[in-house]
Amino acid sequence: VVQDVLDYFIRKKAQCLAAGINDVIIDPGFGFGKTIAHNYALLKKLSVFHLLNCPLLVGISRKSMIYKLLDSTPVDALNGTTVLNTLALQQGAAILRVHDVKAAAEVIRITEYMQKV
């Protein structure tokens, strides 16, 4: 699935550039028509999308890939969301789409600090 999504974005980015659209953000689309295994494979290989030289947006907050794996509910999946946001940031995600802003801000602050030490 990772190669399929990467190939899709390679084509779409070329179309954007050909149309004069230069500001492109890549969102791998966690949860959209993918299995839980597909979503975790995308997250595990998120760094390959840097080949596109575009900022990466990750929207995994409260997704079924978290709460189903944890046998929880979307509202109760904050710990799982925090873990996956951390993993995404460690692989170079530039933008997080979140529901729980305070928790995400703390993840960003700690992750940025860890990258400096």
Question: Where are the regions that the model predicts?
Answer:
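Active-site-adjacent loop and "lid" segments of alpha/beta metabolic enzymes
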Residues: 1-18, 22, 33-117
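Conserved Motif II region of HX4D acyltransferases
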Residues: 29
